[in-house]
Amino acid sequence: MSRPDSVNVAEAKAVIAGKEIKSQQLLKLVAELKKERVFGLARKALEKHQADYLNKRISIPSQTDKRKLTQQLSLCTYKDPDLNPTDKLDSALDFLKGLDSLDLKSNDCTKDQETLSQAGAIFKRKWELTSQTAYLETSLAYYARLYVNRSG
């Protein structure tokens, strides 16, 4: 016999089925789902919310909320155990590229700590999957940029 869904899982399923939710509420729900390690469901709820505001079914979130939602979508995508490992890392990176420049050779490269941290983690996982040294070097470069930005 399977155990019943948690309140958070039930809420996420309702969002996926079409229940409207405000961006701030969704961010709180995603935080709880991550604690429960239900990354796939969190990802699907974030994707549904994103599709709803892109298709103008709900109001567009503030720029700050949109950034946080996209960062959480990236995180939940690359941590979702049900997705193909290579594809999920590429998708997560694409979400981040939609927010900011990730070009380490450019002065326009993001200074956003969460984005840099996730980019470093994604490239580290790419290295773990492929053993390609270039991925590890790129990961370290993102973490170095993060360190420099924090140090000021």
Model-derived segments and their meaning:
Residues 78, 96-110, 146-150:
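Generic detector of contiguous secondary-structure segments
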